[in-house]
């Protein structure tokens, strides 16, 4: 029996056609809402759904590329305080974390979740490039500039 999966399950991904035994297909997959029986009507529905998905995918990819360009033009600046101890070592107080970077990006009007930004714990001064996952395989390089004020 051929069925069209409409949800991801152990047998395959959604929107794929698989061959299963008659009992498994009708009693489990179709009954539980994981699949539809394969016929001309459902085949046309699948083709329409796949064309809609590809059109939506292209739209999302285009907007992600635009967002990548905007992010790569941005530069975030942070100031950290430091002091010099008796042994002439520089002790930096605080650090720039992923949470700080996400908050700054949200203030600038970007809509990103905390998992989109590479986990960081920046203490050293200078310009750092941070990876921001904009869309599946599209990664932007965000400039983070850290300035250390010595007291």
Curated annotation (Swiss-Prot):
Keywords: Ribonucleoprotein, Ribosomal protein, RNA-binding, rRNA-binding. PROSITE patterns: RIBOSOMAL_L9. GO terms for cellular component: ribonucleoprotein complex; ribosome. One of its GO terms (biological process) is translation. One of its GO terms (molecular function) is rRNA binding. It comes from the Bacteria. Coiled coil: none annotated. Belongs to the bacterial ribosomal protein bL9 family. Binds to the 23S rRNA. HAMAP family: Ribosomal_bL9. PANTHER family: 50S RIBOSOMAL PROTEIN L9. This is Large ribosomal subunit protein bL9.
